[in-house]
Amino acid sequence: MRPSTRFLRSVTRTVPIGFRSTTVPFVSSTLRSSAATSNQFSARFSGVRFYADEAKKEEPKDENDAAAAEEDANLTEEQKKIKDLETKLDAKTKEASEFKDRLLRSVADFRNLQEVTKKDIQKAKDFALQKFAKDLLESVDNFGHALNAFKPETLEQSQELSDLYTGVKMTRDVFEKTLKKHGIEQLNPIGESFDPNKHEATFELPQPDKEPGTVFHVQQIGYTLNDRVIRPAKVGIVKDNEN
């Protein structure tokens, strides 16, 4: 028997009959309200217990999901790290390739610079005497002028003049030999075709027995220094009769 029913009966017994008509409705209403409150509390309590039980049941599942999510997060983070490392590796590889290309270019430039410098040094060495040699050429010419001043018949008549001639000639020969040792050589183009890069034409004359445009007379001998013309030869060339 429910407590509300017992309470109703006890009240009914204790209350006088005259008062039952007015008291019973009030008591019944009160009891119904109390019963409803009790039922609502029971329902709420049972709901709380239900949710608590469900929470306890779902707690292991949630923990598993959290662990899986954390594992996924860790995997994703590792993948991000791997991707980041791959990106950095690609960048470093590209940078290393650029450095290698720069190094190869620098080595090539350095070798070219070495070759150019070597050639420049050799040129400077070869032509360092150019100005000095040009200044000496006038002295060599003077030896030639002195020798040409001697007449053959005079040399035969005077031993002293013959000895002087021989001494001057020997001095000139030694001088020219020394110049040749340092790359300075004579340019005597007699009988050669006229070359404006090596010869300087001072006059033209027709020569019946010679080919036009050839050198038939050398007015002044030219000189070269290591195959570079330092003084062109002054020449007379054969003129073409048709012109």
Curated annotation (Swiss-Prot):
InterPro entries assigned to the protein according to its UniProt record, in alphabetical order: GrpE, GrpE_coiled_coil, GrpE_head
Signal peptide interval: none
Q: Assembly and interactions?
A: Component of the PAM complex, at least composed of mtHsp70, MGE1, TIM44, PAM16, PAM17 and PAM18.
Q: Which Pfam families match?
A: GrpE
Protein encoded by which gene: mge1
Q: Where is this region: Disordered?
A: 56-79
In UniProt terms, what function does this protein have?
Essential component of the PAM complex, a complex required for the translocation of transit peptide-containing proteins from the inner membrane into the mitochondrial matrix in an ATP-dependent manner. Seems to control the nucleotide-dependent binding of SSC1 to substrate proteins.
Q: Where in the cell is it found?
A: Mitochondrion matrix
Q: What is the lineage of its organism?
A: Eukaryota, Fungi, Dikarya, Ascomycota, Saccharomycotina
Output the GO biological process annotations, alphabetical, semicolon-separated: protein folding; protein import into mitochondrial matrix
Q: Record's PANTHER family?
A: GRPE PROTEIN, GRPE PROTEIN HOMOLOG, MITOCHONDRIAL
Q: Which family does it belong to?
A: Belongs to the GrpE family.
Which species expresses this protein natively?
Answer: Kluyveromyces lactis (strain ATCC 8585 / CBS 2359 / DSM 70799 / NBRC 1267 / NRRL Y-1140 / WM37)
Q: Which UniProt keywords apply?
A: Chaperone, Mitochondrion, Transit peptide
Q: Which domain of life is it from?
A: Eukaryota
Q: What is this protein called?
A: GrpE protein homolog, mitochondrial
**Alphabetical list of SUPFAM superfamilies matching this protein:** Coiled-coil domain of nucleotide exchange factor GrpE, Head domain of nucleotide exchange factor GrpE
GO function term, MF aspect, one? protein-folding chaperone binding
Q: GO CC annotations? A: PAM complex, Tim23 associated import motor
